[in-house]
Curated annotation (Swiss-Prot):
Class in the EC hierarchy, top level: oxidoreductase
Originating gene: odhA
Protein name: 2-oxoglutarate dehydrogenase E1 component
One GO MF term: thiamine pyrophosphate binding
EC annotation from Swiss-Prot or TrEMBL: 1.2.4.2
Highest taxon in the source lineage: Bacteria
Disulfide bridge map: none
Cofactors, names only: thiamine diphosphate
GO process annotations (BP): glycolytic process; tricarboxylic acid cycle
Organism per entry: Bacillus subtilis (strain 168)
Secretion signal span: none
Catalysis: reaction(s): N(6)-[(R)-lipoyl]-L-lysyl-[protein] + 2-oxoglutarate + H(+) = N(6)-[(R)-S(8)-succinyldihydrolipoyl]-L-lysyl-[protein] + CO2
Length: 944
């Protein structure tokens, strides 16, 4: 890049600082051996001569003069010194509030660079620091200015940022002094008042609710004014939605002061008192609880900001379990949804200004939890980037009882961010003004480059991990220092009084006012004895189950949609083999009238889009499909250009997004869940490459998707597609662990399906789309096929799409209707049902005693349909549940109590399948085949 820049500019006036220093070093090499450097550089030096080295030449005059090698070396050394200060100055900064008086040896003495004060004074300031203030007149002053700039109570790391323009911008912002402009007295007074509120709230809780967990913010009080300022600056720039993710540390304070959750509601949660009569005291706030609820320091909130300063914006603090950092991709997904407009065909239109993600991390969790790296990896990806998130490490330098040296292998908690070229600011949490400078830097960088930025807010933890902890047990010296250390409010108030910004009387009046507001709020809280326990009841729409939904669609509409799905521009060159496959789909409505799985999916998507519902589908290889079945995105075989037929449906004004995801389950599933929660009108689907890999995202299934509504009242209609089925591919490519989803199934929290026909898949997708904005909506887990994608026994008649609807219980076709002869009912779900069907159809006679049915929807259990099936079979003797999974896996453990409970009197319920195993499947395909044959044979063979 340097050579190209030189060749284009051909003028020394444009070179300064490190660029000029580099040029001087190369020129020194050139004078010793002209052929030892790049030919382009040699040509440059031949034409322009030496780079400027004295004041006149550096100022742009055309005076000529020979430059000695020694002078070149001195200038190069001075420039290298300046670069070292920029790169390593943070090592000398005063960012640890508990070590503010620690004396540090001066880094980078002139002697280490072979320089004296006189020599460096002779070098122009602009050579060393182009953006220094005008009062900096020479190289020595420039070096001292850089030392002071890079070792304050705020320090900077951006040497890992590779983009030249970004580095130049970052350098200019820091060295011009723009970040450190004095704040107005009004703003400083407001920050003091906020810090007084933060401290007063925590101290009141500490006195009033002795020993109760609250995960105090004390030691990092500045986090609240930092959030205030990020929100205010962003909203002034046009942001209308701010999404915040954080763990429990300091959460109650953020809820009270950033989200405006009334003190009295928080107090009532400590008091375990009813709060239904408490009315928010400021702003407009919405807080939703589920029927089982959650602890107070996990709850989220929404707030509508309405004032002249910040215009109008919705602030959301996401609900969060104690699983640290897992909220991060959820917040980013919500932010992406808020940024996108989905009311036009094609991909959604993204406006990154509309919404901002703020992610608050812990200093132990940021390097410790892998989900952090997974989420950072999304930051520049087409389907996931949010125009830059602002990260804040709430760094109290300890994780529970574990100190930094035990919790990470890096110097800073923030070092992971370097791998993603995220600029980093370390700032002392005891210096609120430095914190405001960090905010200004972060907001302006994001606005300029639409990239992530990280603030490492370094403070301490005044008490233990929770308020029942005694931290001196494990950190006696640290907590001796903490006890002696004044609060940030005390430090800041003293500073402002000393500077004449406020008087001591003003400080006292602020304290009295804050104390009164808090105590007045407490008086509104009913006493604990008024609280009466009551039985938890499900909301009626949830307890009533899924309503019957008409998902049929007119045959002619389907035919037209199919034609549009196989239509592309004449000049577009579809890959030959794929073209033949796609063109065969036309026959579905002309000749054979059969629809295979992937066509049923495309038709479902097309019809849902035409109905006005946006769709977002992501996953590893989801554009093509893991098994080359989907091909939603066509690639021109000659130009590589892309074409998406679903973007070109006639009379469609709804967006369709499909994205290949990174190789990550957790962050991607979390992102899609967040997108869906924020955009409930959108059909959001996440597809695992194989269902086996879904457990890499287990936290999201356990803590959010299955339980989010019960805990927080947080509805979701997310669809999860998990390829599942035993085909001899070994223990890592066979099982989506359906047993885990069924174990989590309760209170109609989601739907779990294991389907065997294209029509069933078509209808369940359409049913989900039609339910999205209804109270009855819930997530949908589908065990999708692999080899069955092309199995002729899974294809459906077109009429099954146009005239039917989803059937939770699906009877085998071709059965005898002499129900009185039936003594065994074979029930199964998923791929093994097709294996049973194949074997059954090969039986020549002796089949009258058998009846076969598939349970397509496992949860909620279709008791009504199964009972109706039993009623048809008056002489039934046994019900066998057949599965290909081991007995301790699959659906058996879940379904056997249901079947036993509703089975007719005297009818046994039996199991046929693999025995109990620790591994889900055999590694040897031959052994697999024998086991599969045994299972199918046993299910269709009469006992002796």
């Amino acid at each position: 890049m340097f050579q190209n820049s030189m060749k284009q500019r051909m003028n020394w006036e444009d070179f300064y600082g490190p660029n000029l220093g580099y040029a001087l070093e190369l020129y020194d090499q050139y004078t010793q051996d002209p052929n030892s450097i790049d030919p382009d550089l040699k040509e440059m030096f031949d034409e322009l001569g030496a780079p400027p080295s004295d004041i006149k030449e550096a100022s742009g005059t055309k005076e000529k003069g020979r430059v000695t090698a020694d002078l070149i070396q001195k200038i190069a050394s001075a420039v290298r010194l300046a670069e070292d200060i920029r790169t390593y100055g943070h090592l000398n900064a005063s960012v640890n509030p508990l070590r503010k008086d620690e004396k540090k040896s001066e880094l980078f003495p002139l002697s280490d660079y072979g320089l004296t004060e006189e020599e460096i004074k002779a070098i122009p300031a602009s050579v060393i620091c182009k953006d220094a203030p005008k009062n900096i007149s020479n190289g020595l002053e420039a070096i001292q200015y850089l030392r002071n700039t890079y070792k304050r109570t705020i320090s900077f790391e951006f040497d890992h940022v590779h983009d030249f323009k970004e580095r130049e911008w970052l350098t200019r912002k820091i060295e011009s002094g723009e970040l450190f402009q004095k704040n107005s007295a009004e703003k400083l007074s407001a920050v003091l008042e906020r810090l007084t509120e933060v401290e007063g709230f925590e101290q009141f809780l500490h006195r009033t609710f002795v020993g109760q967990k609250r995960f105090s913010i004390e030691g990092l009080d500045a986090l609240v004014p930092v959030l205030d300022d990020i929100i205010a600056q962003s909203v002034k720039s046009g942001t209308t939605s701010v999404n915040i993710g954080m763990a429990h540390r300091g959460r109650l304070n953020v809820l009270a002061h950033v989200l405006g959750k009334p003190y009295e509601i928080i107090f009532s949660e400590f008091q375990h008192a009813p709060n239904k009569d408490l009315v928010p005291s400021e702003g407009s706030i919405g807080i939703s609880y589920g029927w089982t609820g959650d602890v107070k320091y996990h709850l989220g909130a929404n707030r509508e900001l309405q004032d002249a300063e910040t215009k109008s914006a919705r602030i959301t603090l996401a609900n969060n379990p104690s699983h640290l950092e897992f909220i991060n991709p959820i917040v980013e997904g919500s932010t992406r949804a808020a940024q996108e407009t989905r009311t036009q065909s094609g991909y959604p239109v993204q406006d990154e200004t509309k919404s901002l993600a703020i992610l608050i991390h812990g200093d132990a969790a940021f390097p410790g939890e892998g989900i952090v790296a997974e989420t950072l990896n999304l930051s520049s990806l087409k389907g996931y980037q949010v125009g830059g998130a602002i990260h804040i490490i709430a760094n109290n330098m300890i994780g529970f009882t574990t100190e930094s040296a035990e919790s990470r292998s890096t110097k800073y908690a923030s070092d992971l961010a370097k791998g993603y070229e995220i600029p980093i600011v370390h700032v002392n949490a005891d210096d609120p003004e430095a914190c405001l400078s960090a905010v200004k830097f972060a907001v302006e960088y994001r606005k300029t480059f639409n990239k992530d930025f990280l603030i490492d807010l370094i403070g301490y933890r005044r008490y233990g991990h929770n308020e029942m902890d005694e931290p001196s047990t494990t950190q006696p010296m640290l907590y001796d220092a903490v006890r002696k250390h004044p609060t940030v409010k005390q430090i800041f108030a003293e500073k402002l009084v000393k500077e004449g910004v406020v008087t001591e009387e003003v400080v006292q009046n602020i304290e009295k006012s804050v104390t009164k507001r808090i105590e007045d709020a407490y008086q509104k809280v009913p006493s604990k004895k008024e609280h009466t326990a009551c039985e938890i009841e499900l909301p009626e729409p949830v307890s009533n189950g899924f309503p019957d939904v008409d998902t049929s669609i007119d045959f002619d509409v389907l035919r037209k949609l199919n034609g549009e799905l196989i239509n592309w521009p004449e000049s577009f060159n579809v890959f030959g083999k794929l073209k033949r496959i796609l063109e065969r789909r036309a026959k579905a409505f002309d000749d054979d009238r059969k629809v295979e799985w992937s066509l049923a999916e495309s038709l479902a998507f097309a019809s849902i889009l035409k109905d006005g519902t946006p769709i977002r589908l992501t996953g590893q290889d989801s554009e093509r499909g893991t098994f080359a079945q989907r091909n939603l995105v066509l690639h021109d075989s000659e130009t590589g250009k892309e074409f998406v037929p679903l973007h070109h449906l006639s009379d469609c004004s709804t967006s369709f997004a499909v994205h290949n995801s990174p190789l990550s389950e957790g962050s991607v599933l979390g992102f899609e869940y967040g997108y869906n929660v924020h955009s409930p009108e959108t059909l959001v689907l996440w597809e695992a490459q194989y269902g086996d890999f879904a457990n890499a995202a287990q936290v999201y299934f356990d803590q959010f998707i299955s339980a989010g509504r019960a805990k927080w009242g947080q509805k979701s209609g997310l669809v999860m597609l998990l390829p599942h089925g035993y085909e001899g591919q070994g223990p890592e490519h066979s099982s989506g662990r359906i047993e885990r989803f069924l174990q989590l199934a309760a209170e109609n929290n989601w739907t779990v399906a294991n389907l065997t026909s294209a029509a069933q898949y078509f209808h369940i997708l359409r049913r989900q789309a039609k339910m999205l904005l209804r109270e009855e909506i819930r997530p949908l887990v589908i065990m999708t096929p692999k080899s069955l994608l092309r199995n002729p026994n899974t294809v459906s008649e077109v009429q099954e799409l146009s005239e039917s609807r989803f059937q939770p219980v699906y009877e085998q076709s071709g059965l005898s209707h002499d129900y009185e002869k039936v003594t065994r009912l074979v029930l199964s779900s998923g791929k093994v049902s097709i294996d049973i069907s194949d074997h059954f159809n090969k039986l020549e006679d002796g089949k009258e005693w058998l009846h076969i049915a598939r349970i397509e929807q496992l949860y909620p259990f279709p008791a009504k349909g199964v009972k109706e099936l039993f009623a048809k079979l008056p002489n039934l003797k046994e019900i066998v549940w057949v599965q290909e999974e081991p007995q301790n896996m699959g659906a058996w453990g879940y379904i056997s109590p249901y079947l036993t409970e509703i089975a007719p009197e005297g009818v046994s319920v039996q199991y046929i399948g693999r025995r109990r195993r620790s591994s889900p499947a055999e590694g040897d395909p031959t052994v697999h085949k024998k086991e599969q044959e045994r299972i199918v044979s046993d299910s269709l063979t009469r006992k002796n």
